[in-house]
A protein has these predicted regions:
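Active-site-facing alpha/beta catalytic cores
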Residues: 1-129, 171-172
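Non-transmembrane, aqueous-exposed alpha-helical and coiled segments at domain scale
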Residues: 121-155, 159-173
Length: 173
């Protein structure tokens, strides 16, 4: 309760400061609403398909389960059902890229998922771990850049950095 009270007080102080500086929240629409985006792995295709809808104006298909869905390391291979599903929707897409991904395979997947090379469509999420990132990531970055694919690079520092306990549970430091 004390922590909440402290946070509420700090927010109040920030709002008072903004008012003192002449910032009026009633005039600035940016201070009246919040853009909120969600993302998750499109792992369970029956779930994703049940939440996929056709846009009535454009006829394009969108997965309404999230703003961006991503494809994981184990389902990210050419001709997989997951790639086929992702290819058919208009959502921004993420794709995990780790030590098992070869450059040729990545380039083929990018051609499949974003043949028009639309900027902002694909986010590549590195998941190498601290001990493999220097060997694996630069080759992928060079190949993608050389082919001119407009991707966003993102890092998932949790994946690839696991420690397995004696009981077999995976933990992350």
């Amino acid at each position: 309760a004390d922590k909440f009270s402290d946070i509420a007080d700090r927010i109040g102080e920030a709002l008072d400061f903004m008012e003192a500086c002449g910032v009026d929240p009633q005039v600035l629409p940016q201070l009246q609403r919040t853009s909120f985006y969600t993302s998750h792995e499109a792992l369970l295709l029956p779930y994703e398909q049940a939440l996929t809808r056709r846009d009535s104006l454009t006829g394009d298909w969108y997965d309404c389960s999230a703003h961006m869905v991503w494809i994981g390391d184990r389902t990210r291979f050419e001709n997989s059902a997951h790639i086929e599903f992702a290819r058919g929707i208009g959502n921004p897409l993420g794709m995990k890229c780790g030590p098992s991904l070869e450059t040729d395979a990545l380039l083929k997947l990018l051609d499949t998922l974003n043949p028009a090379r639309e900027p902002g469509r694909i986010t590549l999420i590195s998941r190498f771990g601290h001990n493999k990132v220097e060997d694996g990531l630069p080759r992928l970055v060079r190949a993608v850049k050389a082919e001119g694919h407009p991707v966003v690079w993102s890092c998932d520092p949790m994946h690839g950095n696991v420690v397995k306990s004696d009981s077999g549970y995976k933990t992350r430091p």
